[in-house]
Amino acid sequence: MRAEDVVRAPSTPLDAPAFPAGPYRFTDREYLNITYRTDPEALRRVVPEPLRVAEPLVRFEVMRMPDVTGLGDYTEAGQLAVVEYEGEPGEYGISIHVDNFPAIASGREIGAFPKKAGRPRLYVDQDTLVGTLDHGTLPVARATMGYKHRPLNTEQAREELTRPTFMLKKLPHYDGSPRICELVRTQIADIVVKGAWSGPARLQLFAHALAPLADLPVLEVVSAAHVLTDLTLGRARVVHDYLA
């Protein structure tokens, strides 16, 4: 294989990369979002400087993605903190748990998404929208919401989903010392909101050493949204280099 072909390959193995080159288009990407108030000191412990915790709010999300170009069919669940960076409001991606290896690999290698393996689900149980996250055989999170009780303004839904997202990109040298340690910013711009609803919601978190979502306890559910979209993820860009 020629050197230029090695450079152009999106990933390894070279003869069958773990994921294809993006961008990736998501059709019928479905969200269950529950925003809740948590303990401010606990939240500050997981949000890195120079980000600032604006309010002690966390968004728990479960995303069902049945049709993603290049990556197929998968589901994600995770937590995002409401933050500010140099006065700009946004969210910080704390953790994302995914049931699809190409989505994990591409998210970590191309972007800075804090992805690891998990077992999330999003489904309708009679009159209830249910989002769950398990790690192995053990429960980590259970979210419930009344199914399509009230229409949600589509512009409000779009605004929530297109907030800037900040993430931490870390990559070591072969000796274990830091090689890349950056704060990056990404934002969804190409999005069509096909439907949006709200309703009563509850969220229960279970303590787990390797999926510590419960370290950010649910003190009060602030809002809930069920949103159906088509979208393309934006590219990440570096906003702060910790090694500079």
From Swiss-Prot:
UniProt keyword terms in alphabetical order: Decarboxylase, Lyase, Schiff base
Keyword Lyase: yes
Active site per the UniProt annotation: K115
InterPro entries (alphabetical): Acetoacetate_decarboxylase (IPR010451), Acetoacetate_decarboxylase_bac (IPR023653), ADC_dom_sf (IPR023375)
EC number(s) from the headed UniProt entry: 4.1.1.4
Gene3D superfamilies in the record: Acetoacetate decarboxylase-like
Keyword flag Lyase: yes
Protein family (similarity comment): Belongs to the ADC family.
Name the UniProt record assigns to this protein: Acetoacetate decarboxylase
Organism this protein belongs to: Streptomyces nogalater
Gene field: adc
